[in-house]
Each structure stands twice: as C-alpha cells, then as structure tokens.
C-alpha cells in the first residue's frame, strides 16, 4: 500500500466520502459519477477506468447517472474535460477500495459492501496502480443498445405515474410583457399556469395541451418593445455598446519604426444556435417533502442551486437527477426546460409534469453562441512579424446557471417578481 494523500485529485477533495462514489446493490458494485452522458460516450470511458481501478470486469459494475443527492458534484460536463477530471478521481476511489477490501477474489464484492461509506478518501491508504484490462480496449458503448433498438431511454420517454404534460407560451419578443388573458382563461382538458409573463398549460393528454397552447397564443395580447440590435450590423452594435475591457495581454504599443508593412483585417460572426437534434425537455414534481427534477443539464448541481435561488428554496430540498436527451455541442436549453417544468409542477403539487420545448422554442429562446467581431493587425519587417494586436468585441461565452451569482434561467425573467440580477458595472 502507498499513501497518496499529496496526490489526491481535485474531485476527491470536493467529494471526500467513499459512499458518494461507490456502493453495492443486488450484488453489483455501483459507481456514481458527476459527469453526464451527452452522446459522447463518456460514461462508457469512465466505466472502463472505474472497472480497472476496482479490479473488476466491466460487466461487474453498474454506472449510476449523476444525481445531486446520491453522487459527487463534478461541476459541468463541458470542454472535453471529463476524462481528465473524473478519471483520476475514479482511479483514486478504486485504489482506496482495493486497499480496504483486499484482493479481488471470492467475497470481494461482499467486502466492498461492508466498507464504511463515510470513509474519508483524502486520508485513507491506497493500493498501488491497478492493471489495465478494460482501458485501452474498444469496449461496446453502454448507452447504445437502447438507442439503436429504440427502447425508452431519453427524458422525453419518461412516464411516471400521474404525469401531466406541460407547455409554455413564450413572449413574442425579448422584454414583452403579458397583458391578456388573465387567470380566468379556460380551455378543455387543461389548467392555465400564469406568473407575471410566464404562461403555460398543463393537462392529462398531450393533444389537449398542444391545442390549448395554440388557442392561448391567439388569445394573448402583449406589450412589446424593440430591444434587439440590428441583425444586419451586429459588428457596429458590438463595438459601440457598453462593455467591459478585459486585457488578456498588453505589452504596450509595438515599436513600428522598423516596420515596412502593416496588414489589418476585421472578421465577424453572428449569433449561432446550438441546434440540438431534438428540442429540450424537463420533468419535475413538487411535493411537501421537496422538489424533484429530471434534466439533461450539463451541470445538475449548479442547476439545483439556481432553481433554489430563483424560488427562495433550501437547496437541500431540491433533488436533480440527470436523464439523457438529445446531445449538444454548447449550452442548450436543458436548464431552462427544467425550470419550466418546475414552475408548471408548482401549480399542480404532487403531479409530475413533463415540459417539452418545440423546435421554434429552441431556435428562438434557447441559449445562443455569442456574436463576435475582431480586428487583427500585424506589422512586417524583413519578412518577420514586428508587431501584432488582436482585439475582440463579444458578449460573454457562458450564461449557465449560477454564473456570476445569477440563476440564469430563462423563465426567471418572465415572473411577476423577476429574479434580481447581481450588480454589474459597465466600463
């Protein structure tokens, strides 16, 4: 055995309890991770690492989806960092388990089951490196059989007992405020949910909900203002509007006395939709015991905290479980759809509510990749670069829940008492 205390991975420091990572159920070792499956195969890769670290075959472990109550907080699944961040943590967990449970011989799983779940992984002794058996092999993806065979697996496939369908009617434009209808509006088979300019319907049958939403759209009257920039001249809007200056590197003006030629060019890109292959969805159930949420969020712990902040709840009463949906390359509307489901479920306590976005919802109200404009200039002298500058104008490139202290959930801006934003100073 060896003491690797000085080499404890960061994700172990933040989640030091053994039972947060590993347990045994029905004779199978369960491995909990905070990283989530977005279609990139990451859970299979982490399963390979975990199996080897525990000295078990891949078939001898069961991967458990990320869960705010029963699993580690590993932040966001983003930036191609999952193996880099979660892999060392799983290896450390396995090394502790092997040190405590002994050789992987007869009775090994039973000995793992008998381990103290409160064992501190940051101070426990560790076994030496495990043999690579699964890692390095092309193992079959754990998530693909259900997807290939069309078996229910995605969030939109969930049908818990008593579930209601829900839809949300978005304002026709940014900043629009709802004038009509009032809470007396009715349609067959549905219940109206209104909080300020947040407007939705819930019902037993999806067809009734969709019909009611169409009727509601026709009956609504909004107070609108033109708040969007000229899409044909985004570069000018970006360069002239209020902004923060963030110097990345500033070594002063270059010496141009020996520069013989200067090249300058500007480049721009518009706002871009992430455009997942299917729209986002969320499922929530509001009960006396607390709030349960099922989401395909890339960060279930930040989502839990954002929901609690937006509604004034104790985060300990909010439980978020990851369920796969359409994958994404960039921040899609998973978090916003989950919050929609929460607001709808709040109106019908005890009943689970599935809130599904439409394609128009996703393309008009989902998070967008920021527009950018840049100017690059380079001085040349004697065939060498004598000076170089690069200036970029853009909005921030993250608006995920909890960033800079704001819940960052779309419907929060539409409530009768909008969620306050933290103070920001323009420079």
Show the residue positions of the predicted features.
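Structural alpha/beta core scaffold segments of enzyme domains
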Residues: 1-427
């Amino acid at each position: 055995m060896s003491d690797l205390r000085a080499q404890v991975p960061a994700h172990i420091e933040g989640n030091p309890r053994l039972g947060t990572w590993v347990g045994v159920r029905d004779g199978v070792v369960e491995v909990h991770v905070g990283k989530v499956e977005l279609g990139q195969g990451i859970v299979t890769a982490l399963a390979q690492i975990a199996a080897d670290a525990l000295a078990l075959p891949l078939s001898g472990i069961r991967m458990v989806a990320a869960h705010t109550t029963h699993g580690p907080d590993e932040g966001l699944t983003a930036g191609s960092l999952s193996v880099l961040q979660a892999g060392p943590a799983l290896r450390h967990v396995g090394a502790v388990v092997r040190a405590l449970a002994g050789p992987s011989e007869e009775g090994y799983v039973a000995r793992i089951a008998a381990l103290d779940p409160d064992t501190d992984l940051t101070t426990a002794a560790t076994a030496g490196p495990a043999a690579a058996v699964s890692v390095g092999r092309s193992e079959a993806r754990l998530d693909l059989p259900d997807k290939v065979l069309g078996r229910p697996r995605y969030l939109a496939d969930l049908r818990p007992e008593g579930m209601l369908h829900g839809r949300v009617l978005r304002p026709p434009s940014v900043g629009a405020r709802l004038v009509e209808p009032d809470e007396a509006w009715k349609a067959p088979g549905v219940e109206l949910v209104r909080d300020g300019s947040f407007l939705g319907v819930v019902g037993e049958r999806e067809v009734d909900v969709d019909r009611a939403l169409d009727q509601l759209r026709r009956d609504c009257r909004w107070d609108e203002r033109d708040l969007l920039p000229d899409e044909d001249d985004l570069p000018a809007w970006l360069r002239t509007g209020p902004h923060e200056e963030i110097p990345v590197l500033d070594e002063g003006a270059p010496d141009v006395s020996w520069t013989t030629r200067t090249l300058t060019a500007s480049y721009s890109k518009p706002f871009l939709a992430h455009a997942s292959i299917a729209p986002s969805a969320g499922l929530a159930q509001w009960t006396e015991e607390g709030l349960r949420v099922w989401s395909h969020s890339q960060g279930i712990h930040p989502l839990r905290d954002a929901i609690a902040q937006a509604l004034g709840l104790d985060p300990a009463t909010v439980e978020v479980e990851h369920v796969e949906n359409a994958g994404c390359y960039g921040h899609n509307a998973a978090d916003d759809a989950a919050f929609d489901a929460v607001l709808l479920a709040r109106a019908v306590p005890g009943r689970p509510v599935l809130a599904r976005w439409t394609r128009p919802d996703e393309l008009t109200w989902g998070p967008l990749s920021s527009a950018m404009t840049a100017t690059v200039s380079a001085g040349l002298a004697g065939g060498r670069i004598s000076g170089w500058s690069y200036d970029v104008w853009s909005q921030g490139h993250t608006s995920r829940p909890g960033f800079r202290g704001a819940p960052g959930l779309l419907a929060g801006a539409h409530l009768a008492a909008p969620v306050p934003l933290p103070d920001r100073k323009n420079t």
